[in-house]
């Protein structure tokens, strides 16, 4: 128990005297370490959060599925539980957002200054966006007998969790400190400061409510002065029979200080039917009496209101007799807060107008604002009882579905643009997903390269200790590494390039699936030689290669990997093959001759690149198709060795492969397609060892034609879809199961916009930047602008 134990019952036996302080107004009395709150005489509450859904972006059939699943949730509510949904608009914390988005270190000169200006513009834009939603559920329970146990709340929570899981909404129980923070935000709507409890609270003799409560409460007829803010509690008096599922979202999808609380109590089916039968008897009795009275006067007419009510009751009786229909007592409360009385009146007018649009009547709670406020708070207690309730059947109660749009903010994430629906910043951490690997898909001119370069810049600024590697077939990314730009190294690879990579670079301590490092390296070298050969190796050829690889590493092994002078090279293997007695060995050496003593010897000697740089771009524009088939595999092997080395140091490695479709069409025209297969292997390995890999392509149809590439797309948790051409759009929509409303974001043709698919989330985004400044100048691929710059 967090509060010291008291004899609470005496308070209730006195009928709960009027609170003497602001702290006394907060409607809980004890809270326990397991998260349960005592909120009334023998009444206990468990509180948990649930995740919003992008309900409005779902397909029509998906919305219907969610609506039906929500009905099942309501139908499953125990009749001894008071169920409450609490949805509060929570202001964007600009300082927190700024802290998350701004660079961790001041570096890169003018780039840093311009980047910070871009971030600040987006922070200000987000401040005006739709507020994020705090979404809670409170389950309130009062034991009726001595054998009843309040721990049944946890059982009910687990049962509800299965329903929310089916709707793809994550739920988790709130611990007391989390609830306190939410209460503090409700009571201090315009403070916009983080709630913190001192670690020595009890040593000071303090009380938790001292840190939650506002400075004062002043309950007026139709509003409450809460500290320096003005709050008004209203309730829904009447619903339209044809109410649609957008009502709640239209109330809440803004940046006003609005909270909606919905209390639902399921009525026992037998009790409900008995009440309806009794109502029918009463109405039938009234009709019979009117007929008798009218007969005496020479007429036989009956008022329409009675016949209509009887028909409604008979329809209700018939529907309630069905297996999927329940009766609920529903109360809906709306809390509005503003900084001045005039602003409160304006906000009230706005909300009533929104409600009128849906034929919903909203009334004030006159001289009951205190009870109303305590009813709004997430403790599962309706302090106004049935006085403001409406009885609804399952389908009508479920139309008040709580889902609308998600907001996306991760403290550890990077900025992925502005949400095109909510206008708020999208901050995502790809590494939080089950599979952080991803793809960026967009035709030429869609803003693909600019998006990727901005993501690279975001990583460089946000994660200064991480390492970045780009495989660049079109000579696009070298501009990022220039004087006064980002610090890194461009490695140009071509037949005559001075840049060297040693195919034998190895970490002897590494093992995988029961294989030691040399066995794994031997398999890789077989793959390279097979690609160079143009068709599959025979088993005797593999044996010869494996033998020579092990001989080549012998002296390096004896030094336990410490003597780098003894590290073999492709030249070592070439010479060993020439020394073997088998004629096949001479043929294998002949295959390698082109790459050792011939025109393509970039991979014959020891690695000579500056390995201290944390940003490397492999420029393969001039590599040529003949060298590319082997070269891509060797580059990927080098990347893989870097990933292993970085993991030991606690460094994350980010890899971007532009036009990754070349991996599946490497120019070898061989039946082996080894580059694609090896890319699939390295791509999956990187994720398992703390890396983040991204494939980029404009040739989506070519990629989908490859089973391996298609499988990679399906399994990746992170995909960026930029505006698509019509012939690609249909295939993409089918592959990613996009709804028509989601598909519309890919039809706009607006550069730098589209959809981000991150796990279960599909987010419409806009990551355009203004066409000026150092950042834009560094990342722009606009040829006309380039011409103007050099002329």
Residue ranges and their predicted role:
Residues 1-403:
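Extended, folded cores of ATP/NTP-driven motor/assembly subunits in large transport
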Residues 491-496, 718-727:
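Conserved AAA+ ATPase "SRH/arginine-finger" region at the nucleotide-binding site
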Residues 451:
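Hydrophobic positions on the alpha1 helix immediately C-terminal to the Walker A/P-loop
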Residues 739-790:
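Conserved P-loop NTPase
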Residues 458-469, 488:
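Post-Walker A helix-loop "phosphate-sensing" segment adjacent to the P-loop in P-loop NTPases
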